Amino acid sequence: MVKFYDREFGSRLLIGSALYPSPAIMQDSIRESGAEIVTVSLRRETAGGKAGDQFWSLIRELGVTVLPNTAGCRGVRDAVTTAKLARELFATSWIKLEVIADNDTLQPDVVGLVEAAQILIKDGFEVFPYCTEDLSVALRLVDAGCRVIMPWAAPIGSARGITNRDALKLLRDRLPDITLVVDAGLGAPSHAAEAMELGYDAVLLNTAIAKAEDPVAMARGFKLAIEAGRTGFEAGLMGARDFASPSTPVIGTPFWHAVS
């Protein structure tokens, strides 16, 4: 089980709802992933109007928990306003907080992110901040009251996988009581498994599944990879070594093979 604030979930995969070839494939992919939390963009979809009604009907049919986000927001005021609208529309205090600094890299504006998180937490929100892998930023977010931190592995949609393994490991080591979710930049199931092997609590995916040749099959692949990576972490991975270490003992081997 993984805990997000005061709620527990069985799946360690959070999934996005954008970019799928069709609404039906979106639904099938989410079901196949086993995800219990689905992120939605308030800026991309509307809760009113025919198109918006159809989208929300599809989401409701899945019986999942909705995590609205502030994707596309370029400043603190914009992000805070969007978060408050999301709370009214979806009757949830959860918000995936994104404050973007640059349109080319979609890198988080970490200064604005911390400020927005402080404002929203004081207003009763439970914030899921999308941030870089910088420990100092994560510590400021924790000080602001965030109990979930969502560092990127690489820029959104880049499919590069974990580019700064040491920094992500440091976050895990220094924040043992915080729920950590790798968010953005993963492109293959092996990337997700690596994140879980580092001890991360969950992974958030969208583009890697939605843009696959077979999104439904890819959703299943990520589900299995996350389960495998978590199992490996819990089992206790052996440490890497600089030199070889024989797995077969020399006791009982023929004498002519023994080293004198």
UniProtKB/Swiss-Prot annotation:
GO molecular function: thiazole synthase activity
Domain of life: Bacteria
Catalysed transformations (reactions): [ThiS sulfur-carrier protein]-C-terminal-Gly-aminoethanethioate + 2-iminoacetate + 1-deoxy-D-xylulose 5-phosphate = [ThiS sulfur-carrier protein]-C-terminal Gly-Gly + 2-[(2R,5Z)-2-carboxy-4-methylthiazol-5(2H)-ylidene]ethyl phosphate + 2 H2O + H(+)
Entries under CDD domains matching the protein: ThiG (cd04728)
Pfam families assigned: ThiG
Active site per the UniProt annotation: 96
Annotated GO biological process: thiamine diphosphate biosynthetic process
Keywords, comma-separated and alphabetical: Cytoplasm, Schiff base, Thiamine biosynthesis, Transferase
Cell cycle as UniProt keyword: no
An annotated GO cellular component: cytoplasm
EC number: 2.8.1.10
UniProt pathway annotation: Cofactor biosynthesis; thiamine diphosphate biosynthesis
Localization: Cytoplasm
Keyword Ligase among UniProt keywords: no
Residues binding 1-deoxy-D-xylulose 5-phosphate, per UniProt: 157, 184-185, 206-207
Coiled coil: none
Function per UniProt: Catalyzes the rearrangement of 1-deoxy-D-xylulose 5-phosphate (DXP) to produce the thiazole phosphate moiety of thiamine. Sulfur is provided by the thiocarboxylate moiety of the carrier protein ThiS. In vitro, sulfur can be provided by H(2)S.
Oligomer status and interactors: Homotetramer. Forms heterodimers with either ThiH or ThiS.
Family under the similarity heading: Belongs to the ThiG family.
PANTHER family to which the protein is assigned, alphabetical: THIAZOLE SYNTHASE
Protein name per its UniProtKB record: Thiazole synthase
Species annotation: Rhodopseudomonas palustris (strain TIE-1)
